[in-house]
Amino acid sequence: MLQGVQRGYNLPELITLEQYQYIRDHKELDPVLAGFVGFGCSFGGKWYGGYARNKTGTNYALQSKRSLLKDMATLQNAEFVCGDYRRLCIPPGSVIYADPPYNNTTGYGGEKFDTIEFWIAMQLLADTGHTVFVSEQEAPPGVACIWERPFTRTLDRNKSNQFKVTEKLF
C-alpha cells in the first residue's frame, strides 16, 4: 500500500460497507486499495477487523486518506518493504522501522507471531550496525523505550468496551 501511495495512487475518500466487503473478498484485484481499506477503513485499524463506523458518521476513509498523505509527504524517499523480516536483504547501515503484531494479540492474517524470535532478530540487526525502531507496547528487558503515548483503545463501535494502553517506540 505504501509503495502505491508513494507512486501517486489516488486513494478513495469514501468506502461503503458493500465496497468494503467486495474489496475484502477480492484483495488480489487491487493490492494498494486492499491495503488501504484493510487498515484504514477497518474497525480499530485491525486488518479487515470489520467495517469501521460509529454513531456520529465519521468518514474513516477520508480520515485515513488525509492522515496517510500527511505522513507520506515526509517519506517520499523511503524504501517500503512488506514481507517476512527473516527473508529481507537489508543494506548495511539501514534505518529499520518494524511494526510487528503486538505481543499476546492476534497476528497478521490470524497467524501466531513469534515475538521472542522477532526481538532476537532485531537485536542482531542493531548489533550489526543498523538503526532499529520497533512499535510495540512492551519489549524485552534492556531495550530502551524512546517514545510513548497513552491512548484509549475501543473494542466495539458503541464505545462500551474501552481500556487504556500505551503505544511505545523502542
At which residue positions do the language-model features occur?
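Class I S-adenosyl-L-methionine-dependent methyltransferase module
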Residues: 1-82, 86-87
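Class I S-adenosyl-L-methionine
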Residues: 78-97, 102-170
